[in-house]
């Protein structure tokens, strides 16, 4: 039997054995794509099993994540730290081989996949990050960032709407180092897809600016390898789709080519028949040493990385500042002066005490942070002028219409010294005259995603996972529903992605209930490991941005107003970052010696409403504390002593927020001023009155709570 056939059959055997032992899983796709994996991993993929985090490795994404045993088998066979015992513990509690691939759980897994269509979209993010980093950091003779992104995807990924968003942007951005291999087996859970999936996939991708190859025999490793080689040679900077006709469950005499191969164990009898059909006489989980030897990539991977290390050493000698900056950014570390930048930004906001919408406050903070952090990569889903995600430091990202290359801004007229070359957007080779061939202008750092909220969110996940950039993107809060599953995936993966959601309430006014967020803040707060901030003025907004940028292990959602918000005077800025703090005590409104009898908790624009109600109550000698709680999720993580200090147990609590009331009762509220219906189309001031968001109603609600 040919070497490639044995290598593929090793995948098939491990897949069917692991699924059978777990009595759970998907053997069909791994068995069908085994030859594709042999071609890619054996002939083309650049990787080192001993160092899954090598900076210039190729990235591989298994978009059809239910085929996880394909990936686990390959990682084990090629020499990653994934043992045969790990394979035997497939889908078991706390194993390194969960049901779907999870980043940071299994060495060699680049992204968490399972929700179909998101993997190929992550891959677009990976490829975009590689292209931008190459434009920023590579210099003549020093192609230090130079790797491909590969993705396997299936019929389900093709059917998901997000795939249309992703491939459209990949074509527009000319991501020539993105190569996708389509497992075209014509089968889904419900059977043969022909009655409900009639797309001409090749023409669809070509219409989006891709090259296509095939259809080819996806069960012929040599044909697949030749197609990959052809794709790698493309000279037009277009991404490539390779259409691979495969047979799901290949090798299984009675299940191959049927939906029965998809999502259940083959059974002991069928596995025995399959072993015979494949001429694989080995016991479950037994792999011949010769097959291990054919698969092993330890030596080749070590050589590949060592060769790159030599080139990087030369690069570091020529451009020490650039090299250090690249390493810092790939590690996800912030600049050493970030804390000072954050402090200055917050203090400036406090000193100016401007009355602006929090979306504008966000842009003001972004001006400071994007100037200090060249890794910030912004964007908007066709709402830049509303989300205000652009800054002076983040011009629009553009690509040359002819070549597809990243368009750079003007190089500096006076070249920087070698000591000043740490900023890749304006570096030179250390010369002192006009720009040299090594000089680079800045790349664009603001992306026009078009009306593609879901695609934007999942692409940002890929960018964050790749490293080198901190992605943020904007849309209206109501449209966060389009992005929700990608937001959830970012939280699950524990990666730094920042979502800017503006027009956060009925305060947007006349556009009406289709655009007015009611349930969205509460809904986002339910996602584990997602920080949600709804700041109430410029200082709180600056703090929210600073915390989001420092948060390397969780994504952040910033909920921002359309309407202007007055600045809330405050004596101490330090506690804002704890998610909630006392913004006003009774003595502020003339009740110095009066005992506090209640606490008003408010978020966002409603903090001003709470402060106005506090004054009305003070006129009646009713002393209330006002607590601003810009981030319930952050406050919930604080120590018990701090929580008690902010929200004393014995005091009645009244929450005020223009949204669903359900999430507030956990704070022991006696009453909540909120909205549990959809909004209305009317000017914002009329809506505030209609829904009871007046100082008078808040004050009356407090009095009513005190009478109980």
Which residues make up each language-model segment?
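A short glycine/serine-rich beta->alpha loop
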Residues: 2-4, 18-27, 55-63, 106-117, ...
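General beta-strand structural signal in soluble alpha/beta enzymes
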Residues: 62, 151, 160, 180-182, ...
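Terminal amphipathic helices with adjacent charged low-complexity linkers/tails
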Residues: 55-56, 240-252, 256-336
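Non-catalytic terminal/interface segments that mediate subunit docking, oligomerization
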Residues: 313-496, 554, 573-582, 588, ...
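Cofactor-binding active-site loop characterized by glycine-rich and histidine/acidic residues
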Residues: 32-173, 390-391, 432, 436-440, ...
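Glycine/charged-rich beta-loop-alpha catalytic/anionic-binding loops adjacent to active sites
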Residues: 10, 14-19, 49-58, 98-112, ...
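A short, small-residue-rich loop immediately preceding and capping a beta-strand
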Residues: 22, 58-59, 109-112, 142-160, ...
